Every structure is written in structure tokens, then in C-alpha cells.
Amino acid sequence: IILTASNEAQAEVYRSQIEYRLQNHRLPADTHYAVLPDPEGKRVGSGGATFNVMRYIAQQEGTDVGNPFKGKRILVIHSGGDSKRVPQYSVCGKLFSPVPRELPDGRGSTLFDEFVIGMSGVPSRIREGMLILSGDVLLLFNPLQIDAMFNGAAAISIKESVTTGKNHGVFLNDGHDQVSLFLHKQSEEHLREMGAVNEHSCV
């Protein structure tokens, strides 16, 4: 499990949260955990943070390995944003902000805890690969519905109204269940022009 952070200070908070959970047996001890701040203290966004994760994985394996990702199942949670809308969580980041749910042991849950629980069924569905999540959106799905028989990259998406979708990322289907275009935070008009909106006004 790899978390990304915007800077070293945020990364230290994330590391302390993970260490606390490990010491209290609230995370699997045989899983490797890493927290990677944006390189050189410069904000690189989710794309740059993903490349940073890939570099980290390659460096862990050394230069002799042909494919450093072979046989690995990696969960990346991008969590390097500032908590501007909820500044009370800017220190610990949105990822460790509480959610209105009590865990079986009686403690309050956080987005991070929900991600770990929700994604725990994914490794059994894939032999190897990397699942990338946005740390401020709790996406719940049934891992049994994942079709892991693919090459390259795959995306998990949900149908949503265009009024919601225009504020997020929208995949344009090529008609054969492949992504032909990714439209990020586009106007409703542009989404309609591109053919991304169906007859029910959903994307």
C-alpha cells in the first residue's frame, strides 16, 4: 500500500497514522507500506505522483529486474491534496479524516480505514497490477464484478448524472467497452458535444 503526500510534513503525519495502526494490530503486518511525498517539495499532481510511485517500486527491486511490477499487487492512494474545504483536517489530510461509521472494535473510522476494508477483496481478483485511488473519494464496489482479464490499464467507473460528472473525470466509451478519451472537469455542453452523455443525461 503506497500513499502519496504533497510534502514531507504531510508524509510524516501519514507515516505516524500507519505506524499507530500497525502497532495496534489494525493493519496486516505482512503488507509493505510506503508514503511518498511529492519530489523536491514541488507539487506534481496525481499524474506526477503516479510516476513517482513507479520510480519508487523500480528502485526497490534494483536495476537487474526485468519487470519490477511482476507478481506485485499494489494499492496506491493519492492523498497529496490540501484540505481547503475542511481545513480542520489539513494537518492529517482528508485521507485520515473521520467518517460517520464505527468499526467493529469500537473506534471511529477514517477514509483510509474504509479504503483498506473496501479494497481488501481486490487482490484475490488480480494476479498482479496496480490499483490507483483518489484519497478524497470513497468508491465502494463489489470486487467480484471486476473483470481482471485485460492487458494494460483498466478503469473502474460509475454512471452518474452529467451535472455531477462535469466536476470530475469522465471516460468516453469507444463503443467496445474501451476508453477512447478521458475528459477531466469539462462543461456539460462539451461533454454532450463529445458524445459522453447518454439518453438519461448520465456520463
Where are these regions (language model features)?
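Unchanged
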Residues: 1-203
